[in-house]
């Protein structure tokens, strides 16, 4: 797993990406929309904390169940935690901090919804004036994937159910597989609700840019 730091900012109407924290001192912070930390060192986190005057939670804190979907608002920042589903149905806890319109995302692994979101920002940079816009898109993109996974599982459950014969020994295996898939669907549904809760909390926070609350 590669450690990676990326800063996304606007320059002359285009999206720029930097991999150096020194960029913070060079760009106008109003142009900075997103700092993505993927498995970075404590030193990088500390430097960023001091520069932006934020607090980045430790892995253990983010992983605690009651923390994993929490939403905290102070007078100048928002902290939201949400678990992102991996292809193997494992959950990756991610922490988001927004301050002065800048989003900081903290995670420990590659997430395809993040790569997809970056493509969306490149394709339509003007639609992402702040970190709030980035966060909503990250959550929406993951929810789209989650919905696709549910659809796929539901199709599999349906076709497996059709193969059931009442007096067949194979049925036991099929039933176990169906039950396993149904449990996965529950986990994914939970995840979708979790993302929707974060978005609705963001909208209620009063810090949200007006164009997004429509």
Task: List each language-model region with its residue ranges.
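Peripheral, non-transmembrane regulatory/ligand-interaction domains of membrane transport proteins
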Residues: 1-213
């Amino acid at each position: 797993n590669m450690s990676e730091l990326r800063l996304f900012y606007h320059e002359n109407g285009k999206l720029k990406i930097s991999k150096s924290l020194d960029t913070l001192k060079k760009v106008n912070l109003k142009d900075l929309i997103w700092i993505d930390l993927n498995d970075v060192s404590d030193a990088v986190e500390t430097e960023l904390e001091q520069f932006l005057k934020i607090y980045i939670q430790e892995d253990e804190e983010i992983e605690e169940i009651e923390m994993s979907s929490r939403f905290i608002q102070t007078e100048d920042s928002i902290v939201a935690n949400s678990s992102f589903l991996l292809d193997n149905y494992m959950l990756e806890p991610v922490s988001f901090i927004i301050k002065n319109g800048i989003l900081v995302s903290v995670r420990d692994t590659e997430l395809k919804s993040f790569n997809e979101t970056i493509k969306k920002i490149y394709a339509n940079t003007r639609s992402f004036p702040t970190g709030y816009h980035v966060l909503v898109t990250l959550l929406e993109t993951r929810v789209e994937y989650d919905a696709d996974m549910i659809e796929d599982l539901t199709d599999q459950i349906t076709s497996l159910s059709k193969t059931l014969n009442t007096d067949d020994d194979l049925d036991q295996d099929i039933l176990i597989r169906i039950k396993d898939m149904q449990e996965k669907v529950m986990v994914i549904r939970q995840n979708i609700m979790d993302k929707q809760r974060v978005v609705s909390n963001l909208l209620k926070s009063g810090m949200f840019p007006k164009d997004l609350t429509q």
